Regions:
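A short acidic, often aromatic-flanked loop/helix-cap motif at beta-alpha or helix-coil junctions
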Residues: 21-22, 125-129, 148-151, 168-169
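Conserved small/polar residues in nucleotide/adenosyl-binding loops
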Residues: 181-183
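Polybasic, low-complexity association/targeting segments
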Residues: 1-44
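Structural signal for conserved beta-strand scaffold positions within catalytic alpha/beta enzyme cores
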Residues: 15, 119-121, 161
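A generic structural signal for well-ordered coil/turn residues at beta-strand boundaries
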Residues: 9-10, 138, 147, 158
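Short strand-coil-strand connectors
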Residues: 154-156
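C-terminal binding/interaction regions
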Residues: 148-151, 160-179
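Feature captures the catalytic cores and cofactor-binding loops of soluble hydro-lyases/lyases
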Residues: 27, 34-141, 146
Length: 183
């Protein structure tokens, strides 16, 4: 399986300014029974999106019609906790192609890169600026250019460069699914 090449993405973003989001919050363990990558998006942030009676929690940002997009902007230390490839699958299956944060757990970062989700680590100051701008104007476009390794807030022409392993960058640019490569 391969995924779409990631070269340049311009999209609105969904802000999730919560720090220390772990993989069990991203996809609760009770939904990990499947081994195929499809269907996990329905349970992304399940316990935050729905109450115990399976009713939508209107207050959660993914349930707020003001916000949409292919970019998730998350608080510091996103993807911590147990190694759970399903968390990256859920993010991709939901429709996100990029997650922006000021820090990622290493295993989570690699799982994302392996399945076509670009984790972009930026400075805490720039992350706060993105949160502020997107909160004030949800239709703000964010541009993530992988070739240039640059994130930009399009409407105000503010940007910051980010680092990425050259091998992983090449795989994202070409749409290679690294989770299928076994040595």
């Amino acid at each position: 399986m391969s995924y779409d090449k990631f070269i340049d993405l311009t999209s609105t973003a969904i802000p999730l300014p919560i720090e220390n989001i772990d993989t069990d919050q991203i996809i609760p363990a009770r939904f990990l029974k499947a081994t195929k990558r499809v269907g996990f998006g329905d349970n992304l942030f399940r316990d935050w999106r729905y109450d115990e009676n399976n009713n939508i929690k209107e207050s959660f940002v993914l349930n707020n019609n003001s916000y949409s997009g292919k970019i998730l902007v998350a608080g510091k230390n996103f993807g911590s906790g147990s190694s759970r490839e399903h968390a990256a699958w859920a993010i991709y299956d939901y429709g996100f192609r990029c997650v922006i944060s000021s820090f990622f757990a290493d295993i989570f970062r690699n799982n994302c890169l392996n399945v076509g989700v670009l984790p972009v680590q930026i400075s805490p100051i720039f992350l706060e600026k993105i949160f502020q701008v997107v909160h004030e104007k949800p239709q703000t476009n964010i541009n993530v250019n992988l070739k240039k390794q640059k994130v930009s807030i399009v409407d105000i022409e503010l940007s910051e460069n980010f680092e990425i392993n050259e091998y992983k960058k090449n795989n994202m640019l070409n749409g290679f699914d690294l989770s299928l490569i076994h040595i």
